[in-house]
Amino acid sequence: MVKIGVCGPVGSGKTALIEALTRHMSKDYDMAVITNDIYTKEDAEFMCKNSVMPRERIIGVETGGCPHTAIREDASMNLEAVEEMHGRFPNLELLLIESGGDNLSATFNPELADFTIFVIDVAEGDKIPRKGGPGITRSDLLVINKIDLAPYVGADLKVMERDSKKMRGEKPFIFTNIRAKEGLDDVIAWIKRNALLED
């Protein structure tokens, strides 16, 4: 089972990305999802209503505190959810774990996630990639979402591209508009090539 952590600031499009990935990949792969919210299970409920996956393949973890603690310093609740999900589905191939909304320093405990996708959105401004932080610099894949909003918020995608290359070196990043499925195929191709080790 490959575990992919998806993290990023509130509203960046983490849940939309996971919903789109499950919709496009669950027919070919044995998949499940774990979501994290501080005080609710809202993201899990959204997934249950909007995903093609049955409810038993989605677990919502209510962290009750700082979102990055639940995925990094004390990942015990999430590790228990991973164990529970693996018990339910022993042949699970791909488990997507969504963090609660957090800042640019969010990273996953290596026991919890084999790969990390960090999601930011253009509406936060074109300066976000150059601000760095572990989410930007260390994630396996950086997704820059909501590119359709760039002209409305004064964000320059060329600046974001330049700064992403500078901050990430050889590590990949993908521009997306998840709602319109733009860039989604590139994210799926990255997952298949890097996480699932397909050609």
Curated annotation (Swiss-Prot):
It is found in: Cytoplasm. Gene3D superfamilies: P-loop containing nucleotide triphosphate hydrolases. The keyword Phosphoprotein does not apply. Disulfide bonds: none annotated. GO terms for cellular component: cytoplasm. GTP binds at G8, P9, V10, G11, S12, G13, K14, T15. Pfam families: cobW (PF02492). Keywords: Chaperone, Cytoplasm, GTP-binding, Nickel insertion, Nucleotide-binding, Virulence. Disruption phenotype: Cells do not express urease. GO terms for molecular function: GTP binding; GTPase activity; identical protein binding; nickel cation binding. SUPFAM superfamilies: P-loop containing nucleoside triphosphate hydrolases (SSF52540). Its main location: cytoplasm. GO terms for biological process: urea catabolic process. Facilitates the functional incorporation of the urease nickel metallocenter. This process requires GTP hydrolysis, probably effectuated by UreG. Belongs to the SIMIBI class G3E GTPase family. UreG subfamily. NCBIfam families: ureG. Homodimer. UreH, UreF and UreG form a complex that acts as a GTP-hydrolysis-dependent molecular chaperone, activating the urease apoprotein by helping to assemble the nickel containing metallocenter of UreC. The UreE protein probably delivers the nickel. This is Urease accessory protein UreG. It comes from Helicobacter pylori (strain ATCC 700392 / 26695).
